[in-house]
Structure formats: C-alpha cells, structure tokens
C-alpha cells in the first residue's frame, strides 16, 4: 500500500510496527507490550531457561496472576498465604512468582494493591497505550483495543517468542468496520451493544479481520465502555477490535504510572491523534447498526452469538435456515434446559456473577450497585458474588460505599481475579444451575461442569439478583 493512500487505524498501527516484510506476505512485527499471567507462561519461561535465553525487553513485559487465584481471603491474620487447594493451580502461581523476578520482569502479585485481572491492570496502569501492539497468552487480549491499541491473544509458543525477541511473524488481517450510530436508550449499556453486535455478526462474522468500532455510540461511550466492546471482539471471530483514541482516551491515561510524561506525553498524544482512519480509507467489510435496535440483552444458548433482547422468546431450532445452526440450537436448548417459545423473563437463576475482564471496572460496580441499593437478592438466588477487576477498583468502590450496597443486598464482596468467568479456580457454578453472568463466554462448562450461563450487563445481573430471574433492568430503574 502506498504511504499516501488513505489508511485505516489498523493499517497505520500495523505499518508503524513492521520490522521486515517477507515475500510470502508475512511480516515481522515489533511488539510494544507483553502481558503474562500464570496459565500460559510457565512452559515459555522454562523453554527460555533451557535455551539459556534472556527476556529481550523485561521493561516492556508485565506479569500478573489472575486466572487461578482464589477470590476469598488470601492471607492469614499473620500475613501467611492461604494454601491453594488445586495442585496445578498452585504450581502455576508459584512458577510465575518465581519466573518474573528471575527474568527481570515486574510482578504484580496477590499481595499488591494493583493486582487484578491482567486486562484490567494493563489499561489502569497506563501500560496499555494507543497505537501500541500488545499481546498476552489470553483470548480476550483484544480488550486493550478500547484504548486504540492493536491487541490480540497468542499461544504459549508465541509467548516464548515474544519474550525472547519482542517480535512476532504475522500476516496482515483484513479490515472491518462495525459502525453503531444513534443514541442508546436508558438501561442499554456497552455490554448490550457488544452482545447485540455478536448476535448480528455471529461467532465467525469477524474471522480473519481486525474490527474498528466506529459511530456516534462508540464515541459517546466512556473508555471503560469501549474496553468492554473490544474485549468481546474475539466472540464474533475477530483477531482484534479497535476504538479510535480521542480526548477521552488521553484524559483517561494521563498521569497513570506507565504513561508517558512531560515532553514524551506531548509527543505521544500528537502521534495518537494521527492514528484516526483517514477520510477515503476503505474497509474490506462494513456493518452498520442502529442504536434504536439495541435493547438490554441476554444470551439463551451456549455461544455468545445466541443473543436475544430480554423481551425475547427462546427460538425454535427450525427458525434457523442453516442445518448446522439447527443442530447447534437443539444441543444448546438441551444443555440449557430451555424450550422454544419460553419467555427469557420467565427463566429463573440461582447464581449471580458480577466480574470478569469484560465488566469488573468501577463503572460496572456503580451500575450494579445503583440497581441493588435498598434491595435484597431473591431467596432462590443461592450464590451472588461481586469480584472487582483489580485491587484499585476494589479500593475505590469501598471508598464510594459500593461494597456495603452489595453486602446489604446479600452479595459476597470478593478479592480481585478472573473468578467465575471460567472454571479454573474455586468459584464455580454448580451443575444444572443457572448464572446471570457479566463475563464474556457462555460455552458448555465454562463456569464449571454442567453450569448454565446467561451473559448480561452488570445492571441486568443486579436486576436478576433482585427478582430471582432474568429481568428487564428498565423495570427496576428509578
């Protein structure tokens, strides 16, 4: 592509990071930031150790445990660590705690106030920046695209490669624009927007593409809302998702620990401003969504694409034209224990999870607390937990009194971590029970063997807690 041809945001970031272009169409890409956690890094560090290699840029690498950490008390009264029950989880956590300092990498551990979910910590610390290439051995790394970064998940062998070389060999993706225009109505949040997008595109709609989310709705969202949008880019098949950086982005980042300062800040902002997609630039595919079509949303099946407005009815498998979709719908209905024509608002839930890298930031806490204030969870809700995305989110929420709102409503107020987003730690949903969850995946067994997951926004999760069933949050709004 000519340097004078109009380019998209993604193309500009890509071009700025090409170290070498190869004849087969692949490019050696420089990686600006590398986030590591305890699950996908042990083998990578062991391979470095065996080869006698060092981490090339430890200053551009940040290690944060999150997947396996229990969200209940982690230290005894005298400061000793509470033992991790699962041996594999304990080994992974111990390995990261040992590997990070050995290789000169900053480690934000469970004793640090800044510890949390890696995709919350990165933006919060200013480690994630617009225009940067960011990788992590985790599916939801696209989250950082809410700041205008090109961020994507990688496998363990690639984790090793980035640690050793600070580069990756990649093929450039196609470009896709998802434009959301209009104005969101009360009760409709960023989570509802991205669930709706996933329903429109389908689980594979963005395959092979990097999506740029544009339009008035995206511009009007807060940075935390944009992080929620980009977080779920992988759920509609995209390699990454981007929101163009703007004045909101700069205000969010300024003064954060890893953000540039002084003259470096001014230079950075000048470059970030240049990243906007040029007038006349074209995308390989464009999808336009009208905000008036987006309602508080909920999933009914076992894929994030199985989305309905809360007022909707469970679909019949025969309503899908594609035979494979019909078969998938039958399997989903059997697993989820639902029947065609059932009202989503009639579905009872026994568990509530507010947390995950999608929805565990301070705005998410506030949105849920606003619905719960002065109310109690329903008697049929056995288990309701709120898991802040980081120690700093937890501290701020406590300063605002939000923890008291949750506790008085019958919720447990937990320590930061991935928690019940995935069945990899003690926070699991019992088999056959339902959970209204603010996480990003509703796959079979995602929250524990036999667990039935309904993805919703924090406000919708709070509403479900109060009524004991999936509920239109607008009915509870003052």
UniProtKB/Swiss-Prot annotation:
Q: Which GO terms describe its molecular function?
A: 3-isopropylmalate dehydratase activity; 4 iron, 4 sulfur cluster binding; metal ion binding
Record's catalysed reaction(s)? (2R,3S)-3-isopropylmalate = (2S)-2-isopropylmalate
Q: Name the cofactor(s) required for activity, per the record.
A: [4Fe-4S] cluster
- Tell me the CDD domains matching this sequence: IPMI
Entry's EC annotation: 4.2.1.33
Q: Note the superkingdom of the native organism.
A: Bacteria
Record PROSITE patterns: ACONITASE_1, ACONITASE_2
Q: Which UniProt keywords apply?
A: 4Fe-4S, Amino-acid biosynthesis, Branched-chain amino acid biosynthesis, Iron, Iron-sulfur, Leucine biosynthesis, Lyase, Metal-binding
Binding annotation for [4Fe-4S] cluster:
357, 418, 421
Which Gene Ontology BP terms does the record give? L-leucine biosynthetic process
**Pfam families per record:** Aconitase
| Comment on bound cofactor | Binds 1 [4Fe-4S] cluster per subunit.
Q: Where does this protein act, in terms of pathway?
A: Amino-acid biosynthesis; L-leucine biosynthesis; L-leucine from 3-methyl-2-oxobutanoate: step 2/4
Family label: Belongs to the aconitase/IPM isomerase family. LeuC type 1 subfamily.
How this chain assembles, per its entry, is: Heterodimer of LeuC and LeuD.
Q: Which HAMAP family does its entry note?
A: LeuC_type1
- PANTHER family in the cross-refs: 3-ISOPROPYLMALATE DEHYDRATASE (PTHR43822:SF9), HOMOACONITASE, MITOCHONDRIAL-RELATED (PTHR43822)
What is known about what this protein does?
Catalyzes the isomerization between 2-isopropylmalate and 3-isopropylmalate, via the formation of 2-isopropylmaleate.
* Protein name (database record): 3-isopropylmalate dehydratase large subunit
Task: Supply the source organism for this entry.
Answer: Novosphingobium aromaticivorans (strain ATCC 700278 / DSM 12444 / CCUG 56034 / CIP 105152 / NBRC 16084 / F199)
